[in-house]
């Protein structure tokens, strides 16, 4: 802080302003008040006056403090890099020796030069020795006593000053400086020591002078004077620490080198106590005056930033703390013998200044390793700094500022959705930049918020990068990169045969005879409601059969069966002919390009007519071989077994023509035929292996579910270890129930399987939400019509295929007046959560081949939820249809029940007109509606108000009797009018 007035100067010196004003006046400075300005020359005069008044006491110690702030980037536990502020403080204390003591030691060193010359020089990097203590002379100030041994401390890191080759240009008086151990406190302490024998000077003025000296940038000549003054004691301090020295071309007196060598060998420096005489005091006073003049000149110079001289290439082989310098030091010492007049030596100013600047460059990698500064980092500097402390800090900050990097325009592939953090990472910028740009665009986002592709591309373009609309990051592309199964050897495989046909035409019975097992008798209602997969070993080879349902509800299931098959056996009953599901099976087979084999079943029945079946199939473009077509017709009987062998022979012949092959030694691929949720085993899927070999323990992916095959059983319930092509198996271990018809693939990497499954779940969720949104919009328009009722249902089935069929059948029942709403449909037993959902939506729970848990039953009973169980799809559809019929608005029908003629009209006060009537036909009831006819034209329609016979109120009057009646709300009755009596009946409607 620069002080411009006496008051500011006094505040800086922490002394009263009037005392400072008196001192300035006594020093010859013409100032009248504390508000007058104080110049640098006035301060120099004050300092000179105080020194004259208190003797030649000078500042014995100068403290230099250096502070550097830098940043390092370090990764935290989450992997993100964080910026950490690092502040490094360095501090040096320089102590000045007494001139008389230096002169005495110089004389002794010159006297001992001849003795030390022939001695072998010690290595420069000798071990630290404490045998060379520096003892202050008697006339040294008492404050120097604790600092002298500090100069010989073994961990002193800064080099000492060398003997000057010629006197300094600015100051005639040398100012020897020896480096002392740094103070422990972080703040600079610039308080000069005072001799006890001399009068004490004001400490604040001395401290301010030293601070001014620190802040003022010294000239090179002044630096040279300070750094190259003769300092034998400092050299003896040097002997107590290792110091690598590199020789540099510089002339120097030869006498100082033996003295330094002697000091490094650890020889004690004899110190005498010279008598303090008047001549010594006069010499000290002259030295003080010279130094004061130099300080005044220094303070009056304009400030400028000086740069330390750059070291020559190869001149500095190591730093003060690097072992490289130890090897170079002995050679340098040998070259610096006294006899070598033209030898060169290292200039400490250049060396130390370079190490000071090198320290800044070494500091950056050191900071990245540890946030705390290392012990040797702050000592590696030298005395050749640039100007004052502030300028050095500014220079250091400039050096450590990250160099501005050139902007790199990147190509950024933007997917359909991307988070702010991921987008910033792709552009190699901070997320804050992306958020800032989005705020400029008027969008407030967080770092984890997901952006759509269009917005993200705008941000990328705004930040100067090239945006490329990338395809969705579909991990299913990994499936295309898997080893192709065709690389493995393709071997012949068994044909997969699907049995299709109309319901009750004998498909399962036919398979039952082939398998020699009673399956049909175990089916509920004698009809098949699941796909059954079996493989049969015949004398001609293995054949895999898929039995599909024939009921109309199972269209999707039959389509899946046709997709997975090689050959279709179309079963047609000889006594029934072609039916709707027969035609549908033909269409499925043709759409899949699958060859047909027609089995005309039930030929053992008396009413069987195979020829009629052929004619009907020809109409459906299924031409038998005897008619010139390519479809074999085989008459069979599932009851007697007639024609079964011919059927199998035709099937195997078709398979032989197809030349069915599949790789065996390859990862398995297959199709989910059926899936269900087993209470004890979890999700269970029936898989038809189409290629490769599925082994127990394989990681499989089926639609949006994945897992490891924990158990594998065949259709007979036996545990197996592997399944080859065309073999149906049941597997356990999937995470959830897959959808029937999903493709199954075995993967080597479970992580990749999980990734693909989660991706598919996300896609399915998006599609489902989009469908729900569309359905809500449609239902909104549908519900605009009045009287639309909704029947909410919750459907739980045993297998996924049955759920699909039942939901489709129930949804078809919807009409304009009553709509079926399937609130929830899933595979598995009826749980408590299903009942809670039914309570919330007021739904009916339908269980198809499943039962409710005990807790769910109690909850349903207590809340009045209707739970219905079915095992035949007909019954479920019929009962829901009946319930919907009950919800239909009844049909209203008008029925005429009588005819009355008005014979007389009586007018009675307070009542009005009363009609005396005769019932001509039918009867008249009191609550009936009346239509008044006048000249056979309807004149009024309303209700009877009262009906009397004589004086009694009656409920009805039959034909042939007279009565009196009044009309509600009408008195317009005339003789001869006819009253038509009618009732409105409600008739229940059906769907």
UniProtKB/Swiss-Prot annotation:
Report biased composition (Low complexity) as residue ranges: 106-164, 190-206, 221-258, 267-276
Q: List every stretch annotated Disordered.
A: 58-82, 106-405
Q: Where is this region: G1?
A: 501-508
Region (G3) residue spans: 547-550
Protein residues bound to GTP: 501-508, 547-551, 601-604
Molecular function GO labels:
GTP binding; GTPase activity; guanosine tetraphosphate binding; translation initiation factor activity
Q: Where is the composition biased (Gly residues)?
A: 379-388
Highest taxon of the source? Bacteria
What keywords tag this UniProt record?
Cytoplasm, GTP-binding, Initiation factor, Nucleotide-binding, Protein biosynthesis
Positions of the UniProt region annotated as G5: 637-639
User: Which GO cellular component terms, listed alphabetically, does the Swiss-Prot or TrEMBL entry include?
Assistant: cytosol
Q: Where is this region: G2?
A: 526-530
Q: Gene3D superfamilies, per this entry? A: P-loop containing nucleotide triphosphate hydrolases, Putative DNA-binding domain, N-terminal subdomain of bacterial translation initiation factor IF2, Translation factors, Translation initiation factor IF- 2, domain 3
The Basic and acidic residues compositionally biased stretches are 279-289, 395-405
Keyword Nucleotide-binding in annotation: yes
Q: Give the residue ranges for region: G4.
A: 601-604
- Span-the-membrane segments of this chain are none
Q: Where is the tr-type G domain?
A: 492-659
Q: Name one Pfam family in it.
A: IF-2
Q: Which residue ranges have biased composition labelled Pro residues?
A: 165-175
NCBIfam families listed in its UniProt record: IF-2, small_GTP
Q: What does this protein do?
A: One of the essential components for the initiation of protein synthesis. Protects formylmethionyl-tRNA from spontaneous hydrolysis and promotes its binding to the 30S ribosomal subunits. Also involved in the hydrolysis of GTP during the formation of the 70S ribosomal complex.
Q: Which family does it belong to?
A: Belongs to the TRAFAC class translation factor GTPase superfamily. Classic translation factor GTPase family. IF-2 subfamily.
Q: What is this protein called?
A: Translation initiation factor IF-2
What organism is recorded for this protein?
Bordetella petrii (strain ATCC BAA-461 / DSM 12804 / CCUG 43448)
Name of encoding gene: infB
């Amino acid at each position: 802080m620069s002080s411009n007035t006496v008051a500011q100067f006094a505040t800086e010196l922490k002394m009263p302003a009037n005392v400072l004003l008196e001192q300035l006046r006594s020093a010859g400075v013409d100032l009248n008040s504390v508000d007058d300005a104080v110049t640098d020359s006035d301060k120099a005069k004050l300092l000179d006056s105080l020194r004259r008044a208190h003797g030649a006491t000078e500042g014995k110690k100068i403290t230099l403090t250096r502070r550097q702030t830098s940043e390092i980037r370090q990764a935290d536990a989450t992997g993100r890099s964080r910026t950490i502020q690092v502040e490094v403080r360095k501090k040096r204390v320089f102590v000045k020796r007494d001139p008389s003591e230096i002169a005495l030691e110089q004389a002794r060193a010159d006297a001992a030069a001849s003795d030390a010359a022939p001695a072998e020089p010690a290595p420069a990097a000798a071990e630290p020795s404490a045998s060379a203590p520096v003892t202050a002379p008697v006339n040294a100030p008492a404050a120097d006593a604790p600092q002298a041994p500090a100069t010989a401390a073994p961990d002193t890191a800064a080099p000492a000053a060398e003997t000057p080759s010629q006197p300094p240009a600015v100051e005639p008086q040398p100012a020897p400086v020896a480096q002392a151990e740094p103070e422990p406190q972080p703040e600079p302490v610039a308080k000069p020591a005072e001799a006890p024998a001399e009068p004490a000077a004001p400490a604040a003025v001395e401290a301010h002078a030293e601070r001014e000296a620190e802040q003022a940038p010294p000239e090179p000549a002044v630096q040279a004077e300070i750094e190259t003054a003769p300092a034998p004691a400092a050299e003896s301090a040097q002997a107590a620490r290792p110091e690598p020295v590199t020789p540099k071309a510089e002339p120097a007196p030869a006498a100082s080198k033996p003295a330094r060598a002697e000091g490094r060998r650890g020889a004690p420096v004899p110190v005498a106590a010279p008598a303090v005489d008047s001549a010594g005091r006069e010499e000290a006073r002259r030295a003080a005056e010279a130094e004061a003049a130099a300080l005044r000149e220094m303070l009056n110079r304009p400030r400028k930033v000086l740069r330390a001289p750059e070291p020559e290439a190869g001149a500095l082989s190591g730093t003060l703390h690097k072992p490289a310098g130890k090897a170079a030091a002995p050679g340098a010492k040998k070259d610096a013998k006294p006899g070598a007049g033209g030898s060169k030596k290292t200039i400490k100013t250049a060396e130390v200044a370079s190490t000071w600047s090198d320290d800044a460059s070494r500091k950056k990698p050191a900071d990245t390793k540890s946030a705390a500064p290392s012990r040797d980092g702050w000592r590696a500097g030298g005395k050749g700094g640039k100007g004052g402390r502030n300028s050095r800090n500014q220079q250091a900050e400039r050096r450590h500022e990250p160099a501005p990097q050139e902007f790199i325009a990147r190509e950024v592939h933007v997917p359909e959705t991307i988070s702010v953090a991921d987008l910033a990472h792709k552009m190699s910028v901070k997320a804050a930049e992306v958020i800032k740009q989005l705020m400029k665009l008027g969008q407030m986002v967080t770092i984890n918020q997901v952006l759509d592709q269009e917005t993200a591309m705008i941000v990328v373009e705004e930040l100067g990068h090239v945006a490329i609309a990338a395809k969705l990051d579909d991990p299913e592309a990994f499936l295309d990169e898997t080893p192709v199964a065709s690389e493995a050897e393709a071997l012949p495989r068994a044909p997969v045969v699907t049995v299709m046909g109309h319901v009750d035409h004998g498909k399962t019975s036919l398979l039952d005879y082939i398998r020699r097992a009673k399956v049909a008798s175990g089916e509920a209602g004698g009809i098949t409601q699941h796909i059954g997969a079996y493989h049969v070993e015949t004398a001609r080879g293995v054949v895999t059969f898929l039995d599909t349902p024939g009921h109309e509800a199972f269209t999707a299931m039959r389509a899946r069966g046709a997709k997975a098959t090689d050959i279709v056996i179309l079963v047609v009953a000889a006594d029934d002919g072609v039916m709707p599901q027969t035609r549908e099976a033909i269409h499925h087979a043709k759409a899949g390009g699958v060859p047909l084999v027609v089995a005309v079943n039930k030929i053992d029945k008396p009413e069987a007519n195979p020829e009629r079946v052929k004619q009907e199939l020809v109409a459906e473009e299924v031409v038998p071989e005897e008619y010139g077509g390519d479809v074999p017709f085989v008459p069979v009987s599932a009851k007697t077994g007639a024609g079964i062998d011919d059927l199998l022979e035709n099937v195997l012949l078709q398979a032989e023509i197809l030349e069915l092959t599949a790789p065996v030694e390859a990862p398995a691929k297959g199709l989910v035929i059926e899936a269900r949720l087993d209470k004890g085993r979890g999700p269970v899927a029936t898989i038809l292996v189409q290629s490769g070999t599925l082994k127990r323990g394989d990681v499989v992916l089926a639609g949006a579910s994945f897992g490891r095959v924990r158990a594998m059983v065949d259709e007979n319930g036996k545990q197996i270890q592997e399944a080859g092509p065309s073999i149906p198996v049941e597997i356990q271990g999937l995470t959830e129930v897959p959808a029937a018809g999903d493709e199954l693939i075995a993967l080597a990497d479970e992580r990749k399987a999980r990734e693909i499954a989660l991706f598919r779940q996300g896609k399915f969720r998006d599609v489902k939400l989009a469908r729900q949104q569309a359905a809500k919009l449609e239902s909104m328009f549908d519900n605009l019509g009045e009287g639309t009722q909704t029947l909410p249902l919750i459907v739980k089935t045993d297998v996924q295929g049955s759920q699909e069929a039942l939901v489709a059948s129930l949804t078809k029942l919807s009409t304009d007046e009553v709509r079926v709403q399937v609130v929830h449909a899933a595979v598995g037993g009826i749980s408590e959560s299903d009942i809670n959902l039914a309570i919330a939506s007021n739904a009916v729970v339908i269980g198809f081949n499943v039962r409710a848990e005990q807790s769910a039953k109690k909850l349903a009973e207590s809340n009045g939820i209707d739970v219905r169980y079915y095992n035949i799809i007909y019954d479920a559809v019929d009962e829901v249809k009946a319930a919907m019929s009950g919800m239909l608005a009844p049909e209203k029908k008008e029925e005429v029940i009588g005819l009355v003629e008005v014979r007389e009209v009586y007018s009675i006060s307070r009542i009005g007109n009363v009609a005396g009537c005769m019932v001509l036909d039918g009867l008249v009831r009191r609550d009936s509606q009346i239509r008044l006819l006048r000249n056979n034209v309807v004149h009024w329609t309303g209700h009877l108000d009262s009906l009397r016979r004589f004086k009694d109120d009656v409920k009805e009057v039959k034909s042939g009797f007279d009565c009196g009646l009044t009309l509600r709300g009408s008195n317009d009755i005339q003789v001869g009018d006819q009253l038509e009596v009618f009732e409105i009946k409600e008739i229940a409607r059906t769907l």
